[in-house]
Amino acid sequence: MLKTEMRNPRTMHIDKMATEEMVDTMISESYNAIKAVEGAHKEIAKAVDVISEAIAKGGRLLYIGAGTSGRLGVLDASECPPTFGVSPELVKGIIAGGNECMFKASENAEDMAAAGERDIVANNVCEKDAVVGISAAGGAKYVISALKKAKEAGAAVIGVACNKDVPIMDVCDIFICADTGPEVITGSTRLNAGTAQKIILNIFSTCTMIKS
């Protein structure tokens, strides 16, 4: 079983906790996200260099993901123009199911492999670009299919997941595993996995813009 889907022994009885204990437990568990990112710092640095090279060649940074992972990519991309004064086309976020899935969950979108390919083609991904696929569990068919198509187009391909030995790693030039472990609520990867992913994406965009 994937670690992100396992039950967390420290929160088995969180529903019985007093409010303050519940809050303290969630704060304590959130440190796992920071530790997971620290553990992947070498791969993150390699990815920053690859993304920076893509930007220097006149390429773009594209994030692609489903659900929370996709939303985090769109969020990071949307903050780049006001923060760094760059074109909205330089850093783009693509979410499975389209922009309406930013506001309304579509649980089947992550399994639509053909849509991943289509979205890469629709965004004219080429050899100048760097594409970051984000999948907490590491097996979203939409993301894996998109990364395969991006690699066919000659783009640099980076994968971000929160489990080891998962399908996404087989299609990446660089694979980043932020091993966040079991969530406070079983399988709710919007929590620690999402926090770790947001930190990583913040690092990608910020360090890249500083280097550019």
Where are these regions (language model features)?
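Short, basic, glycine/proline-bearing loop/turn elements
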Residues: E29-G39, A105, A130-G133
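Short, positively charged patches
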Residues: M6-P9, A45-D49, R60
